[in-house]
């Protein structure tokens, strides 16, 4: 069984470097005229079959990547036509908003491509390092090198739109990975059901408040990067609907619910910046020390909040926090009684889904309905939708940690227990 093999080939060095101080709009104007054709090179030979594996669906992807990805080899061979050149470019957003991009997405994507039969020359994976100019440069480089498909997680809306426009102008199909880009007629979306992610956070929060015996919950909400990421809005709509009965990205302070909870305040962490998020919460907690329950949009923000709470002497099982991404630190906080749970988005599924979609589209085929199973809607304009492949997330607590993230190898017991301590893990049955 192949898991997160970081030494495996397929990660290529960036061919275009960021342009300091250049705006997305300026870079688009600069590169548009010079972008080369994405048509396949002449003289290539094809092999394989253009048949999509029977029964391929969002349920096909297991932690044993090879079991499903290897079935795509004939289709990948047909799609790439034997070319010894770039066919699919992948761009991840940064290394700071979440550990997932480096620790999970990149190695799983590498494995998925390799198991599907792609050579190292036929795909490359870059990371924009948090720079919109770098992300656009990487996309431009991929197109110039002949990529027919771009798998891209946009840093923000304007960057995603700029890349989608550039891709469409060159006949390149784009797959928005994890974060949607509502632009272009050749754009698809691969992710988890974002509103469901939010609902799981809300449901987990409510269960935790009850289990921890929080009296008259005075709730503070720390949302994700709503200024840059439409997913953050969907997450908020999900947990706000569950907790406050309002499917909205923002709820006014003073809102209450039938469980006796009261919203004392909310804010968002710009650009998913955990440090800024921690500062925002610290200021709110200082101004309103009666806060005794919190909702956070991911584990990075929860970690920042918990660090502040511990610094103020708060003991376990006193102030609930929430998260997503199922980080090892998040799992440790759950075991220690500082975090209620975390939404586990099995990245190995998302990586396989993206590679399967890319292979099908590269072959000129239409993804089956069991794979392209829904649509995503622009939070800013409900009339704008995008075809989507939506995976199902899981809420992880102390009770199911062993059977989910540990069993899958997403977080190892060693990683979790190094943080939480052997005695804490032993008490929870994590070994």
Question: Which sequence ranges carry the predicted segments?
Answer:
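C-terminal motif of bacterial Sec signal peptides marking the signal peptidase cleavage site
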Residues: 30-34
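A residue-level marker of the well-folded mature domains of exported/periplasmic proteins
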Residues: 2-14, 35-431
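Sec-dependent signal peptide hydrophobic core
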Residues: 16-27
């Amino acid at each position: 069984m192949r898991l997160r093999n970081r030494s495996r080939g397929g990660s290529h060095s960036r061919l275009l470097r960021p342009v300091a101080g250049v705006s997305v709009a300026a870079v688009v104007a600069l590169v548009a005229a010079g972008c080369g054709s994405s048509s396949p090179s002449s003289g290539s030979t094809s092999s394989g079959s253009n048949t999509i594996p029977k029964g391929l669906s969002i349920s096909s992807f297991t932690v044993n990547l090879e079991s499903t990805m290897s079935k795509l080899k004939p289709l990948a061979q047909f799609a790439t036509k034997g070319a010894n050149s770039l066919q699919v470019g992948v761009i991840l957003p940064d290394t700071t908003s979440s550990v997932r991009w480096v620790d999970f997405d990149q190695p799983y994507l590498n494995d998925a491509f390799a198991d599907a039969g792609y050579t190292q020359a036929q795909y490359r994976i870059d990371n924009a390092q948090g720079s919109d100019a770098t992300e656009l440069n990487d996309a431009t480089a991929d197109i110039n090198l002949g990529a027919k498909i771009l798998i891209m997680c946009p840093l923000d809306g304007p960057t995603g739109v700029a890349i989608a426009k550039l891709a469409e102008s060159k006949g390149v199909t784009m797959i928005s990975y994890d974060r949607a880009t509502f632009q272009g007629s050749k754009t698809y979306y691969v992710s988890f059901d974002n509103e469901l992610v939010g609902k799981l956070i809300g449901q987990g929060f409510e269960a935790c408040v009850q289990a921890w015996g929080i009296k008259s919950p005075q709730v503070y909400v720390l949302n994700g990067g709503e200024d840059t990421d439409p997913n953050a809005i969907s997450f908020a709509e999900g947990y706000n609907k569950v907790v406050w009965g309002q499917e909205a990205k923002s709820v006014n302070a003073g809102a209450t619910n039938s469980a006796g909870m009261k919203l004392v305040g909310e804010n968002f962490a710009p650009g998913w910046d955990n440090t800024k998020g921690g500062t925002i919460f610290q200021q709110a907690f200082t101004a309103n020390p009666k806060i005794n329950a919190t909702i956070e949009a991911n584990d990075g923000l929860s970690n920042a909040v918990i660090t502040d709470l511990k610094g103020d002497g708060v003991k376990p099982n006193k102030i609930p926090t929430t998260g997503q991404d199922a980080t090892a630190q998040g799992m440790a906080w759950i075991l220690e009684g500082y975090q209620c749970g975390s939404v586990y988005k099995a990245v190995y599924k998302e990586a396989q889904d993206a590679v399967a979609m890319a292979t099908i589209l590269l072959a000129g085929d239409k993804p089956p309905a069991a794979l392209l199973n829904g649509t995503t809607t622009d939070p800013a304009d409900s009339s704008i939708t995008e075809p989507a492949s939506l995976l199902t997330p899981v809420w992880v607590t102390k009770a199911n940690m062993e059977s989910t993230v540990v069993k899958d190898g997403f977080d190892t017991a060693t990683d979790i227990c190094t943080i939480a301590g052997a005695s804490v893990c032993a008490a929870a049955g994590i070994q």
